[in-house]
């Protein structure tokens, strides 16, 4: 939503308005980059012999049960580094949070894959008033040339863009294959943390990612660049072993606790 609104404003659209329904976790891109280049992904790490592959392995070795603790530490750093930014964002009326347990954007990404924004300028436009904001609000009614919000406001508009969140992988599986297969596989992504949009029980790993599923020959690959870089190797090895008809011991096919 931020990027669409910012692009419309940059192209000269007048009276761009964002309608925010619920809080969003916001982290500035520059700050996120600074924090992520501390330690294993820093120039100092490279000089000490820690390659990208080694750094990826170190990150992947962290147990998902405790990664939120690191996230909480990062949030405290974020709040101090960007204190003025968050104060201005709050004053603009934009609703934001740092996750249900203050563990931040990265953990929310692992748990639900939505509800966050890596800020590359959209927030500044909201703070400056270049992008109008209605928050919290939802659309109650459309007319020929306007919308009515649930707060009673009417907004004249020539264009309405729905930026209503990310679709899940199993929703795409249902569209591409069938609802039956999607339900057979079950929910993809998330850890079973018991937080919003990531229902329990605890899974221990990301659901149905890079491993055998309940549907033979159906695999799911996704994530950010770092995850794609790292886990694609293990997915490729599993596929190669099957093509070569090598004997394979599987820890266990995921139990389906939630349908797609």
Label each region the model flagged.
Residues 2:
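Residues forming the Rossmann-fold NAD(P)(H) cofactor-binding site
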Residues 6-22, 29, 64-260:
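Flavin (primarily FAD) cofactor-binding/catalytic cores of flavoenzymes
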Residues 25-69:
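A catalytic-pocket lid/entrance helix-loop region that shapes and gates access to the active site
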